[in-house]
Amino acid sequence: MADRLAALLAHFSVSARTFHAGALCGINALDATEPFGQLHLVRDGRVEVRHGVRKALEIDEPSLLLYPRPMAHRFITDKRHGATFVCAHVQFEGGPANPIGAALPPFVCLPLARLPACQPILELLFLEAESENCGRQAMLDRLFELVLIQILRVLMEQGQVEAGMLAGLADERLRRALVAVHEAPERDWSLEALAEQAGMSRTSFATAFRDRVGLTPGSYLQRWRIGLAQKHLRQGRSLKLIATEVGYGSEAALSRAFRAQTGSSPREWRNSDAVDA
């Protein structure tokens, strides 16, 4: 079976930065002003989670709570005993253009008991969180990044994402076409060629792709290519080289597709991205 995450993670990395380990008591809030999300591991204790004034969920067993994008949230715990957390900021390279981050729901809550393959990582992470070992920060950050990959696996394997790219990657046939696009965006992918990758007829493939992924195959291909182009633009690469690598025959063809996708030319986008950085 093709590796569904290899090309995604090779092109668009995910990173974590641990910022809390220990008890949280009473009311604790995180705003959405910073350009990253959070991954919280609740080791013990009861936690009420609120999004604004609305009670979103109640956690009463060891669980993880992932916010892949900035989203304000509050935790309400017992004032005296609280709950034990280990928390990290998470960042998906490219921000909103990152296809992994964009494919995830606004938040994910999973009991740790549903992550059996992750137990050795979690045990080491909790042990490290309690220690004062040298390299503790770097160790925790890397362990959180491994947990993120495990979350992606679970969401696909357990079919917990109903639409979008991850839903397509969970489909035994569609995943072959998606992986082919991710691994070789420079190829001249026709609808027939992608349907052949999936082992489906042209019509069946187009319908199934649109229903599961939420885009036509052609729209998805363009979005993937332009996402890669944006990454290369941030790295200062020339439009001519980028056009060849992401599947456009010329700078002009890339510029037309780029403007259709983003509303601006590659140079305009690069200048505005540099100002925002």
Regions found by a protein language model. Give the residues of each.
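Short, Lys/Arg-enriched, Trp-marked, Pro/Gly-tolerant hinge/linker segments that flank
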Residues: 107-116, 129-144, 148-187, 191-198, ...
